[in-house]
Regions:
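Short aromatic/hydrophobic "clamp" motif used to bind/position activated sugar donors
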Residues: 88
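A conserved acidic beta->alpha catalytic loop
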Residues: 26, 41-50, 70, 92
Length: 293
């Protein structure tokens, strides 16, 4: 009987042939060997599937699946249904890991048995792999739901979670092509303990043509996600913390809209923020900053 791996690494891919080898190689190079790598090809039209076939022959820890194009949320759920590990983590096919990522995280989890999700920081790189930033956002530990309502502080490619989280609360919603990672970690934050470790655990590739379009779509998706979260988990935080989180989210969205020249929309979003926190200093500061710009 084939032994069960300790860790399952999940990689969805769609037309990322040029980066796929680097992602897979970074998993195979890990200093911790007890893992399986499940790659789901989401209907690629390049040579990704042929590349996967090469790797599968070389290493029996690699398992590959193909599906018609349905988005990475569905691809991740496909992999989750096949996963056998006690721990689950994700690596997108255009990103990669440092060689000791898994070993470091398993050591942290062993020392912290009450922690369910461990995550860290990213190094942002461009299409060619050159580093562009290490200026990471503020991240949090413990019950982090109130912080997650304001913004997603958990970087998908750096995180590792105990399998019980998925068994008890499920995987991706499968409803969105954008921000399925936020949906997952926000949901988990209603019940589980997170631990942030200030270590760079993933190289995250950002394409020039993705930045503005992805950010607009992500704000729209995140807005739907936080409202759905409040309906599904009304006791995750207090009413005051929900309102504060919503207000700060809307301030962030409004400031972004103003920064790309959509000032009228920005003011409409500021009014939404005022509805949740009419006397919030951050709301009024945001309004003043946009008005005077």
């Amino acid at each position: 009987m084939e032994s069960k791996p300790l860790v399952t690494v999940i990689t969805p891919t769609y037309n990322r042939e040029q980066f796929l080898r680097q992602a897979i190689d970074s998993v195979l190079a890990q200093t911790m060997f007890d893992f399986e790598l499940i790659v789901v090809d989401d209907g690629s039209t390049d040579n990704s599937w042929e590349t996967l076939a090469e790797y599968k022959v070389k290493d029996n820890r690699i398992r590959t699946f193909w599906q018609p194009n349905q988005g990475q949320s569905v691809a991740r759920n496909h992999a989750l249904a096949e996963a056998r590990g006690d721990y689950i983590c994700f690596l997108d096919s255009d990103n990669y890991w440092p060689v000791d990522k898994l070993q470091q995280q398993l050591t942290v989890l062993e020392k912290n048995p009450t922690v369910d999700v461990v995550y860290g920081d990213i190094i942002t790189i461009d299409k060619d792999g050159s580093e562009t930033s290490r200026n990471n956002m503020t991240r949090y530990s413990g019950p982090i739901a109130k912080w997650m309502l304001r913004d997603n502080c958990v970087s998908m490619n750096t995180a590792i979670a105990r399998r019980k989280c998925f068994d008890q609360m499920g995987g991706m919603s499968g409803q969105r092509r954008v921000a399925d990672d936020y949906d997952l970690w926000l949901k988990f934050s209603a019940s589980y303990q997170f631990l942030y470790v200030p270590a760079f655990w993933a190289y995250y590739r950002v394409m020039d043509d993705q930045i503005s379009s992805d950010k607009t779509a992500r704000f729209d998706s995140n807005e739907a996600i936080i409202h759905s979260f409040r309906k599904s988990y009304p006791n995750a935080v207090s009413a005051a913390e929900f309102n504060a989180g919503f207000a700060i989210f809307y301030v962030r969205k409004a400031r972004y809209l103003a920064s790309v020249g959509r000032k009228k929309e920005a003011f409409r979003v500021f009014f939404k923020a005022l509805g949740y926190r009419p006397f919030g200093i951050s709301v009024w500061r945001g309004i003043a900053a946009v008005t005077l710009r």
